[in-house]
A protein has these predicted regions:
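Short coil/turn connectors between adjacent alpha-helices in alpha-solenoid helical repeat scaffolds
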Residues: 28-35, 70-83, 115-128, 158-171, ...
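Flexible helix-coil transition and linker loops at the boundaries of alpha-helical arrays
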Residues: 46-60, 91-105, 136-145, 178-191
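TPR/TPR-like alpha-solenoid helical repeat scaffolds
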Residues: 187-203, 229-245
Length: 245
């Protein structure tokens, strides 16, 4: 009898966790398309402060922290970025000790080292190889890890050409990540990561002055999410201006 009650209790907890996880994903997506980073931070901090988190929820939290850190660096809010990099690393250490989805864990380590470079470019020669190594190890563990391909793309995108960086090579990695993401149509529905990847592709095509492709991807994004503020109000008008001229 006690075992039956225990099983039912665990099932209820898991069901509640799944529902909360789904709600968090939707709320983060809505914050992303509206550029509501205050709302994003509120969701992220609430999850961080939960006493008990499953491995799945903890990995999702790292994803939200990853997105927020990138925004902080873009806004030159270095102290905030450093704070959340530290939190994300602690969360990854827990996941690594639990031997949970190590391919994703390594891909996030690669991303965090990339952020370290963004905060201090002079550290690039020392940190850059670590970022690359983690991304490569992530792919060794799982060739189907789209996020690891995205990180390989980021490494190529931000690495100076004198050190081997290439925007065209970055595009190749981004497109590979896109193919892998799109294999599971359900997971990319209302997924900020998918829109973010498509936006990176727009930016990369713009950088190599392939405005036709950049325009096409802007229109793909707006078809998926017409209310995506960053594309609708900023990138698409900029791309159209370049395309027409």
């Amino acid at each position: 009898m006690e075992r039956k009650i225990y099983t039912i209790t665990i099932s209820i907890i898991l069901l509640i966790s799944v529902r909360i996880y789904g709600n968090d994903k939707t709320e983060i997506y809505n914050a992303y398309i509206r550029n509501d980073m205050a709302g994003w931070k509120k969701i992220m901090d609430r999850i961080q402060n939960q006493e008990r988190k499953s491995n799945e929820i903890l990995l999702s939290l790292v994803n939200y922290q990853y997105g927020y850190i990138g925004w902080c660096i873009g806004e030159a809010n270095e102290k905030e970025a450093e704070f959340y990099i530290s939190l994300a690393r602690n969360n990854l250490a827990v996941l690594e000790s639990n031997n949970y989805n190590l391919s994703m864990v390594y891909a996030y380590y690669a991303a965090l080292y990339g952020y370290d470079i963004g905060l201090s470019i002079i550290r690039a020669p020392f940190i850059g190889p670590k970022s690359m190594k983690y991304a490569e190890n992530a792919l060794k563990l799982d060739q189907g890890n789209s996020f690891a391909y995205l990180q390989m793309g980021n490494i190529q995108y931000y690495m100076p050409s004198v050190f081997g960086g290439s925007v065209n090579e970055a595009i190749r990695y981004f497109l590979q990540a896109k193919v892998l993401m799109e294999k599971n149509k359900e997971t990319i529905l209302q997924d900020w990561n998918y829109l973010h990847l498509l936006t990176l592709i727009v930016q990369a095509y713009t950088d190599v002055e392939d405005y036709r492709s950049a325009k096409a991807y802007c229109e793909i994004i707006l078809k998926i999410e017409p209310q995506f503020v960053w594309i609708k109000d900023e990138l698409y008008p900029q791309v159209m201006h370049q395309f027409k001229n």
